[in-house]
Amino acid sequence: MSEPAGKTLTEDQVLLIAKALGERRRYEIVKRLGERPDALTCCAVRDCTGINPATLSHHMKELEIAGLVEVVREGKFASYVLRRDVLEAFFQRLREDLA
């Protein structure tokens, strides 16, 4: 769900993000990514959350599908960056819908 900055999210996109954030471990991952301005490696996310590798892989895929994280690949290594633009668009849409 890569959307340009400033683009309004559809209702389906908002629901997908809400579903992703509604799971405790995914919410924890987003919080950890939000603490950093740069990318976190998969190992660093695992270390700071304590989530086992298979479960972490599943949650990272769900966050990627929701558009909340971007995967940065360097060779065989993957790092993750929080898509702050998507998160802000989500908040903006909630403000509009709930006003």
List the predicted regions and their residue ranges.
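Amphipathic alpha-helical dimerization/coiled-coil segments
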Residues: 1-14, 31-36, 83-99
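Short, hydrophobic-biased segments on the C-terminal half of alpha helices
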Residues: 60-61
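Short beta-strand "wing" residues that participate in macromolecule-binding interfaces
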Residues: 71
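N-terminal helix-turn-helix DNA-binding core of bacterial DNA-binding proteins
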Residues: 12, 16-55, 74, 78-85
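Glycine-centered, phosphate/nucleic-acid-interacting loop/turn motifs that mediate DNA/RNA or nucleotide
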Residues: 67
